Amino acid sequence: MPELQPAAGAVANPQQPRIGHWKQKLLAARTQLREELSARKSPRELLRHQAAVVDRLLKEVWAGHAMPRDVTLAAVGGYGRGQLFPYSDVDLLILLAAPAEAELARKIEELLGTLWDIGIEVGHSVRTIDECITLAAADITVQTTLLEARLLAGRRALYSRFVRRVSDELDPADFQQAKLLEQQQRHMRYAESNLEPNIKESAGGLRDLQTVLWIARAAGIGRSWSELSRRGVITAIEAREIQQHEQFLQSLRIRLHYCAGRREDRLLFDFQTPLARAFGLHDRPHRLASEQLMQRYYRSAKAVSHIATIVLQNLDARITPPSDKEYHPLNERFGIRDELLAACDERLFERKPSAILESFLLLQRHPEIKGVSAPTLRALWRARRLISPAFRKDRRNREQFMQLLRSPERVARMLRRLNQYGVLGRYLPVFGRIVGQMQHDLYHVYTVDEHILKVLRNVRRFAVPEL
């Protein structure tokens, strides 16, 4: 069924006398929310509060239009999650028991017209359950949207049938595969937006966090970071870290919306300085406020990417348990399982810190290894704190690092991986200080660490092709 639009030149809306009242309520609520942001309230609370305000208003408008009993109103998308950013669309699903006849179509048009008149920017669809299921089968975006549906008003029995059908038609393994492909394509699409990254869509952004929770929810494993922690998918420390990064990104996006005065997810050059001021940052002798903010963003995005990789691997092991993959030892400390490097035990790096750099040597020397297993990746991330002055002075560690640099192959790739896992900046503190550091001008497209790694890669290409 095509989406219904408020008809141009239609008869006057019977709710016209109440529209001014509803409009004032919405404006007052939005003003209060902006004041709460200035009071440094939790971004999660702000997003939920904004959604709750719109919930109450929608229910009031729905009741005012006396919608038929066999019609249901549901929140979907981000609004369905109970989160609403200042200038985001309010995504709605009007669920029908049967295709709409003329009178019902007219009432829906009036309802949508009222919502637009009071200042709610609505993204909507009007569908039967069968139409929802058909579209979801053909489009992973629609399927994801329906997964987060939340009842607002109308017939509960119809909504319950809809939820059961969506659940029955959902295959967790297929859903996971489709979402991971979608994420890979999205990362490629936004790979060149280094100077002005997209808080929502770029790698390490909010969409990556949502992808993890979508997959977990589809598999019935959990709907929140605390729930995933209780289920053993992530550790309590990882849950706390990822919530901290999520709240920072949410706070940044909220302020960006207010700064732009519209729905905007790109950290455009012109907004970076006022955003930094909104976070209480000030210029220093050698670092602008905007550069401080962007470094925090880049480091947060890197951490999100790393932890999300661990969680996605753990979810994959539960959704599609691998057949009994053999462990092929490389030495006493490491082996290969399912094409991934695996440590003999998760406490290896604590017992033998030199194994940290050894793991990268093995990745460099064995191109058949496609990555690092989740337990080893987690242990490696935790072991960064062991890279101390004594670690750097240790002869074995110095030799291993030089072996990485002297290798005829995959040097640039390993340096990038060392940086990605937070090891390079720990081993070379001078490099650590410039991780995520950008220069606030239109000439320097990459952060300083990324620029250095690209230069090293290009210099090597003059003599040795990276295989």
Q: What are the residue ranges of the model-derived segments?
A:
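A nucleotide- and high-energy phosphate-metabolite-utilizing enzyme signature
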Residues: 1-467
